[in-house]
Amino acid sequence: MADVAGPSRPSAAAFWSRDFSDEEQSVVYVPGISAEGNVRSRHKLMSPKADVKLKTSRVTDASISMESLKGTGDSVDEQNSCRGEIKSASLKDLCLEDKRRIANLIKELARVSEEKEVTEERLKAEQESFEKKIRQLEEQNELIIKEREALQLQYRECQELLSLYQKYLSEQQEKLTMSLSELGAARMQEQQVSSRKSTLQCSSVELDGSYLSIARPQTYYQTKQRPKSAVQDSASESLIAFRNNSLKPVTLHHPKDDLDKIPSETTTCNCESPGRKPAVPTEKMPQEELHMKECPHLKPTPSQCCGHRLAADRVHDSHPTNMTPQHPKTHPESCSYCRLSWASLVHGGGALQPIETLKKQISEDRKQQLMLQKMELEIEKERLQHLLAQQETKLLLKQQQLHQSRLDYNCLLKSNCDGWLLGTSSSIKKHQDPPNSGENRKERKTVGFHSHMKDDAQWSCQKKDTCRPQRGTVTGVRKDASTSPMPTGSLKDFVTTASPSLQHTTSRYETSLLDLVQSLSPNSAPKPQRYPSREAGAWNHGTFRLSPLKSTRKKMGMHRTPEELEENQILEDIFFI
């Protein structure tokens, strides 16, 4: 090993020494450099040109040891220098190729470390994203489980509802089959009844339908022929069909002791106007016998034999109205219409027996007919409301036209009055003397005042009679004040002529409404009504009294069955419509 003398020994020269430690030390292995061609001896690498660096500490140690051990000899000096040289080897001793290889290796290591960091970061991000996705999938799985449970619950509920609906359908089907069987039985019974009608016709002479509380459908309300619309024709047809299948209670006013003896259902009102003939009975006999079978509890009354309705004013034929055989003088021995004796009529009602099935069937038919009648009335109500709206619009237009014509007439009247005043004043000045001028002025003023009063009275009458404005009467009443001044009595006459026309139209309207209501409500409580007569005079309103009607209503409420109460409820609905 080469040793370099320090500054303490300037005379010392470099020398080579061989130590046993050189053989013991192994060859240095550097990756990428240690190959067969790259292995060199240590002696070649050691050049005497001083590429070797010595540290200051080593040099000082070597100098101290040299100073302390001067007498020991060269052997110790060589050993110390060789040890320092072995420890001071560096990379500068390598060749350029080795240095390049080492630099490339360092760059590769740096790049690999950077890639490692990038891949680690990427793996961490991917791991986090995967964890998020896993959490989302778990949440979705939980939601799916909950939805599945809810759907299972709904499925169970739907199954329960389906089972209930199937039960309901089965019950309805059973009810339908039962109703069909009942209808078939009812039809068979109707056929049997129709076959029995022929056998009962022989006894129908003794048992007239008027003996019961059944009004004749074709003569119950016979109105005079009036112009009717198609709606009224259909309503009248439905009313006739309805009357054929229902009992018609009619109010009759009796003394109080007679009302206590007789059921309210059997009372009839039979009145006759003096100048009117009775109508011919046209009711069919088997239908009345059928009603007699249905209603055996109704006690027959003699007055019902003659209960034949009359004409349009609701003025009726009046036979005596005593109910019991205690008054034989007030009624003839036989009825002039049905030609039957009272004995046969009194004793013939107990022969018929009640038929429960026919009662039920007829009550059902009545209910159906009442419901149909109610529907028809609702339709008619809508139509009438529509027509009423149209009539109201027409009435408003007519009122506007009338108001305009009144304004025009007032203007014309004022102009005529002004012209007449001027003409009369000039004529008076010409034909009369000057001393009478004051009196003429007074007369002019009074005449003008009377003319204005007459015009105002005429317009007030026209306001009252808006339904039928009479322009001819107004122009006829207005006269020339100069020739014939109108007295105050003419104003009263004009007002009275206008008011009865209004009363007549309103009474006609109320009478038609009351007749319609009474025809639609056969089982409803009878109400006091007035029947004005055009030919025989006014009807006596005092004949109908409320006190016996209240007692009859109480009796009717006590003897009614649930079926009759239900019919009355439907009839009240129809009456309300």
Swiss-Prot record:
Q: What Pfam families does the record tag this protein with?
A: KIAA1328
Keyword hit for Membrane: no
Residue ranges annotated as coiled coil are 91-167, 358-402
UniProt-annotated stretches for the region Disordered: 251-282, 425-444, 449-492, 520-540
Q: Which gene encodes it?
A: KIAA1328
Please verify whether the record's keywords include Coiled coil.
Answer: yes
Please describe the quaternary structure of this protein: Interacts (via N- and C-terminal domains) with SMC3 (via central hinge region).
Name-wise, this protein is Protein hinderin
